[in-house]
């Protein structure tokens, strides 16, 4: 039976922190110029909630602002993220391409399941030519709920997946695996938290470790 791996994007494949602070600063500078924000950019608070869907992000970072301002801020933030990706400010984590090549050579299907928006995800996939390996990229924007477990369920149904593991750095990835009866592989990377990773079936410190894990998953 062929194996599938479903990857998170932010903090798992893509080093979001390379463009995060830059884009968030751009966004809050815009708010300051409009007299809608009067203090420093709340980067630390954003890091705490990294990985949640963007509507929840703006509820947390802009609790006193109207929905209209949050929507405008969301749109501007997305513009800045995409532009910073397109001009090469971001980076993949080490060994992404090597691992993807290995997985494809070993008949493993690769999918992305992310809380990121479609335009943002497409910018990453296109800039780094990840479509050479990825079967399809899925965004939480494509489903009614904002739960990653439901997004993973969509992938499983569409491709009739019988055997898979989810690779990600946050509890939402681990829970998505558990709720769908899949193996969870936690990534101990930049945004990971030890208390969350403790719930994963296994934990890696580098994506290259997937080359040794894959044969075990196939047993």
Give the residues covered by each predicted segment.
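Non-catalytic pre-domain segments flanking phosphatase-related domains
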Residues: 1-7, 163, 219
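N-terminal helical cap/lid subdomain that shapes the substrate entry/recognition surface
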Residues: 2-94
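Conserved phosphate-coupling serine/threonine residues in phosphotransfer and NTP-handling enzymes
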Residues: 12, 114-116
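A short, structured active-site edge motif that brings together acidic residues
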Residues: 46, 130-146
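Short, acidic loop-to-helix structural element flanking the phosphoryl-transfer center
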Residues: 83-112, 122, 149
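Surface-exposed amphipathic alpha-helices with a cationic face
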Residues: 97-104, 156, 174-178
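Conserved Lys-Pro-Asp/Glu-containing loop-to-beta segment of HAD-superfamily phosphomonoesterases
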Residues: 148-174
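Acidic, Mg2+-coordinating phosphoryl-transfer loop and its flanking beta/alpha structural elements
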Residues: 166-202
């Amino acid at each position: 039976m062929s194996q599938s791996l479903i990857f998170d994007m932010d903090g798992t494949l893509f080093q979001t922190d390379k463009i995060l602070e830059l884009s968030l600063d751009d966004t809050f500078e815009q708010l300051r110029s409009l007299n809608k924000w009067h203090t420093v950019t709340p980067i630390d608070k954003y890091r705490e909630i990294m990985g949640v869907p963007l509507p929840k992000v703006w509820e947390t970072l802009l609790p006193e602002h109207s929905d209209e301002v949050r929507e405008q801020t969301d749109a501007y933030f997305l513009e800045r993220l995409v532009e910073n990706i397109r001009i090469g400010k971001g980076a993949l984590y080490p060994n992404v391409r090597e691992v993807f090549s290995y997985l494809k050579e070993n008949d493993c299907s690769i999918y992305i399941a992310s809380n990121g928006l479609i335009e943002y995800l497409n910018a990453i996939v296109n800039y780094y030519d990840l479509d050479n390996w990825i079967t399809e990229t899925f965004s939480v924007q494509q489903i009614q709920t904002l739960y990653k477990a439901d997004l993973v369920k969509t992938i499983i149904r569409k491709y009739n997946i019988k055997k898979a593991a989810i690779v990600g750095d946050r509890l939402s990835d681990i829970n998505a695996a558990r709720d769908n009866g899949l193996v969870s592989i936690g990534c101990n990377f930049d945004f990971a938290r030890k208390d969350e990773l403790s719930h994963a079936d296994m934990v890696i410190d580098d994506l290259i470790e997937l080359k040794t894990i894959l044969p075990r998953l196939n047993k």
